């Protein structure tokens, strides 16, 4: 089931590649396209609204708002066209005001205004503007919903190419619609001849200077406020669509340059971490440490995942170990015992071990425990950071060695000693963590293979060697030293915090 492998060296999965052949199908992608280059260690946070894709989404939302504004403004003026209409308004208003000999009937003028005089029919301009606003609204709404759906197809260069092309087409059409709308709602914009050759311009000029002003004539001869707002919104949409094209192309270029591996479309989950000791040291250096005393210098005793354990963090000791082979039972379910026995008792145990014949290595490598719930790693306590009963006695000792701070010079001296001890404390914790992580990894591996397999003996042998290493005087001295340093650092921290509070 598992091939026999040695744990004395790094795993085979790490190291420089031995060849540069074609990539296998395990990775799902090949070399970058020709002409592009990928920049390592340059993550692109595309989930932010300040990124190019975020700017595209924000501009699309702005286009939707402007389209709604255009629809509302233009729709509010349709009553003049369809309620009284060009025929009704001009038939009753213009025909009655100027007489039939000037324009003839109202119906003939309504057609003459739009066709005979070569102008733009206001009803047609309103309809064209509303149609383009609705088309732009639906297109940008579809693109925005697709971008927010977080599907794989919308996170590619092809999608933003479609955004670029569609936005460019909409910008061109919307520009034409805005110009046509201005020509339709403003009669003076389409009159270039004089009064004698442009009766409509003459009519509007006489209407402005007359004391009697028909409201229908005034509507068709002037630009209403809502019509002006609609025209301005049309040109703003053209500008926003051009910006969408720019940021869409910028998104495509970033994907091409940095590669999909460096593009982060979603925010990484935030992991809750404990108090950062180094951050506290910086605050102490700046004189701004006002943290609570209970935020100790705890160093996590929970081992990291075996998958995340560093592959080069530990080199197993020789098979001889720190003790003779007869001093330790082959069973792996014995919990760790502290080295509290007297030297005489230790010598007696050593003599008994010499008298007994040594066990064969294969037998010593056996570990009879099969229930993972009884794993001794769940019950052992290595170096701990919790408050113990002996801390109360240690506080008196540290209080005599490090009394309360009374000057800035003493505070600086405490801080320098704190920095030195902190480095040593973290180094000890890292060394012990590497051993514990390796033990947990081996324990899980022993649970996953059968005792009759050949690799079980090798794994169990290394597991027992690590257990011997944890019982060694060197490991126990490091464990005790880390505990002493932890209490010392905690005491110095309280002294510095108390001094900072008094000084204000």
Curated annotation (Swiss-Prot):
Residue segments, region Interaction with TJP1: 379-385
Keyword Cell membrane assigned: yes
Coiled-coil segments on the chain, per record: 412-471
Annotated effect of mutating residue 379 to D: Lower binding to TJP1, higher binding to TJP3 and decrease in phosphorylation. Lower binding to TJP1 and TJP3, loss of phosphorylation and loss of regulation of TJP1 binding
Gene3D superfamilies associated with the record: 6.10.140.340
Membrane topology: Multi-pass membrane protein
Bias-annotated ranges (Basic residues): 361-370
Pfam families assigned to the protein according to its UniProt record, in alphabetical order: MARVEL (PF01284), Occludin_ELL (PF07303)
GO biological process, alphabetically ordered: bicellular tight junction assembly; positive regulation of transcription elongation by RNA polymerase II; snRNA transcription by RNA polymerase II
TM spans (from-to): 58-80, 124-148, 159-183, 228-249
Residues carrying Phosphotyrosine: 379, 383
Reported modifications of this chain: Phosphorylated.
Distribution of this protein across tissues and organs: Localized at tight junctions of both epithelial and endothelial cells. Highly expressed in lung and liver. Expressed at a lower level in brain.
Domain MARVEL: 51-253
Entry GO terms, CC: bicellular tight junction; cell junction; membrane; plasma membrane; transcription elongation factor complex
Region (Disordered) residue spans: 324-396
Keywords annotated in UniProt: Cell junction, Cell membrane, Coiled coil, Disulfide bond, Membrane, Phosphoprotein, Tight junction, Transmembrane, Transmembrane helix
Residues in compartment: Cytoplasmic: 1-57, 149-158, 250-504
Main location: membrane
Family label: Belongs to the ELL/occludin family.
Description of its domains: The C-terminal is cytoplasmic and is important for interaction with ZO-1. Necessary for the tight junction localization. Involved in the regulation of the permeability barrier function of the tight junction. The second extracellular domain may also be implicated in the permeability barrier function of the tight junction.
Function per UniProt: May play a role in the formation and regulation of the tight junction (TJ) paracellular permeability barrier. Interacts with ZO-1.
Protein name as catalogued: Occludin
Species annotation: Gallus gallus
Phylogenetic classification of the source organism: Eukaryota, Metazoa, Chordata, Craniata, Vertebrata
Gene: OCLN
């Amino acid at each position: 089931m598992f091939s026999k492998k040695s744990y004395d060296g790094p795993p085979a999965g790490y190291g420089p590649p031995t060849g540069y052949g074609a990539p296998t199908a395990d990775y799902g992608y090949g070399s970058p396209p020709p002409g592009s280059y990928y920049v390592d260690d340059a993550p692109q946070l595309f989930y932010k609204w300040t990124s190019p894709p975020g700017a595209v989404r924000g501009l699309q939302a702005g286009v939707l708002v402007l389209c709604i504004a255009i629809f509302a403004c233009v729709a509010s003026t349709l009553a003049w066209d369809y309620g009284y209409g060009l025929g009704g308004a001009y038939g009753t208003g213009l025909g009655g005001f100027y007489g039939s000999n000037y324009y003839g009937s109202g119906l003939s003028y309504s057609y003459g205004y739009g066709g005979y005089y070569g102008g733009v029919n206001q009803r047609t301009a309103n309809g064209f503007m509303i149609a383009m606003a609705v088309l732009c609204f639906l297109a940008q709404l579809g693109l925005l919903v697709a971008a927010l759906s977080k599907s794989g197809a919308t996170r590619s260069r092809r999608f933003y190419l479609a955004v670029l092309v569609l936005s460019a087409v909409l910008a061109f059409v919307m520009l034409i619609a805005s110009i046509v709308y201005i020509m339709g709602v403003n009669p003076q914009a389409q009159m270039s001849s004089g009064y004698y050759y442009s009766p409509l311009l003459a009519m509007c000029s006489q209407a402005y200077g007359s004391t009697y002003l028909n409201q229908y004539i005034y509507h068709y001869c002037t630009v209403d406020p809502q019509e002006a707002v609609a025209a301005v919104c049309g040109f703003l949409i053209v500008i926003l669509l051009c910006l969408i094209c720019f940021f869409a192309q910028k998104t495509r270029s970033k994907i091409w340059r940095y590669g999909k591996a460096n593009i982060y479309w979603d925010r990484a989950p935030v992991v809750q971490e404990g108090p950062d000791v180094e951050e506290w040291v910086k605050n102490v250096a700046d004189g701004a440490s006002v943290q609570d005393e209970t935020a100790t210098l705890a160093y996590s005793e929970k081992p990291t995942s075996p998958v995340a354990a560093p592959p080069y963090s530990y080199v197993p000791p020789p098979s001889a170990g720190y003790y003779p082979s007869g001093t330790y039972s082959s069973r792996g379910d014995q919990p760790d015992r502290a080295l509290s026995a007297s030297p005489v008792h230790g010598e007696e145990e050593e003599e008994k071990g010499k008298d007994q014949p040594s066990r064969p290595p294969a037998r010593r490598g056996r570990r009879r425990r099969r229930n993972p719930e009884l794993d001794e790693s769940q019950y052992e306590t290595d170096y701990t950071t919790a408050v113990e009963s002996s801390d109360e006695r240690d506080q008196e000792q540290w209080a005599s060695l490090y009394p309360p701070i009374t000057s800035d010079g003493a505070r600086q001296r405490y801080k320098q000693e704190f920095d030195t001890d902190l480095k040593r404390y973290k180094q000890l914790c890292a060394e012990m963590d590497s051993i514990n992580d390796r033990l947990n990894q081996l324990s899980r591996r022993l649970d996953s293979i059968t005792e009759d397999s050949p690799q079980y003996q090798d794994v169990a042998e290394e597991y027992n060697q690590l257990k011997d290493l944890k019982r060694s005087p060197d490991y126990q001295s490091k464990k005790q030293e880390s505990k002493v340093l932890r209490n010392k650092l905690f005491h110095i921290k309280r002294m510095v915090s108390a001094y900072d509070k008094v000084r204000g």
